[in-house]
Design a protein with these regions (language model features):
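Carbohydrate-binding surfaces of carbohydrate-active enzymes
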Residues: 1-78, 83-196
Length: 196
């Protein structure tokens, strides 16, 4: 039981009473925040999804008052992400690449069979109609080896005009993955490969 007003300086890195008491206060407050987020945000979100016969998807990581394993247990499908930077095929961009393995670990710990990922997200340097199946295959294979088994393409919503090419885009942030792309028809074999 803490006097919150008395312990507010602990949030700025100051010691209140003693280092031990300050550490215990910060641990308890962070644990409480994590529990509240897991139950009242992610748990409630999943309950609302189920009430409407929907499945909850979530990326259970990044900065916030939460604990990844705990919130991942409150959702139906854990989702990681990986970005499609053509040069990153040969580099280890662990900032975004590690999330697939994290999501797979959370899913497997909770007995969930599906591990999804926001896949091939474009970056300003690479999302200039430069993506193509051969350039993306190695990255996808690496993510499959980390536990991915459901691709969720990071792309724009629609192409309303049937003959406009190349059509609408998300600007620099999404993969250009739709029927207006010049490689769409020849890429059927790759589509079948990643859908297996």
């Amino acid at each position: 039981n803490y006097d919150l007003l008395k312990h507010l300086p602990a949030f700025t890195g100051r010691i209140v009473e003693s280092a031990d008491i300050t550490d215990r206060f910060l641990w308890d407050i962070r644990r409480t925040q994590g529990d509240l987020m897991a139950d009242n945000y992610y748990g409630k979100f999943t309950a609302l999804c189920h009430r409407h016969n929907m499945i909850s998807y979530c990326q259970p990581y990044d900065r916030g008052p939460m604990e990844e394993m705990q919130i991942g247990s409150r959702i139906d499908i854990n989702v990681g992400e990986f970005w499609n930077n053509l040069s990153s095929i040969f580099q280890n961009n662990w900032t975004m690449r590690r999330t697939v393995k994290l999501s797979a670990a959370i899913a497997h710990t909770n007995g969930q069979r599906v591990v999804a990922a926001e896949s091939y997200t474009g970056e300003p340097e690479s999302a200039k109609w430069q993506e193509y199946p051969f350039g993306m295959k190695a990255l996808g294979d690496k993510m499959f080896s980390q536990g991915l088994n459901r691709i969720v393409f990071h792309r724009f919503a629609h192409q309303p005009h049937p003959t406009a090419r190349p059509g609408m885009t998300m600007g620099p942030w999404g993969i250009h993955f739709d029927r207006t792309n010049t490689w769409w028809e020849p890429a059927k074999a790759w589509h079948m490969y990643i859908a297996r």
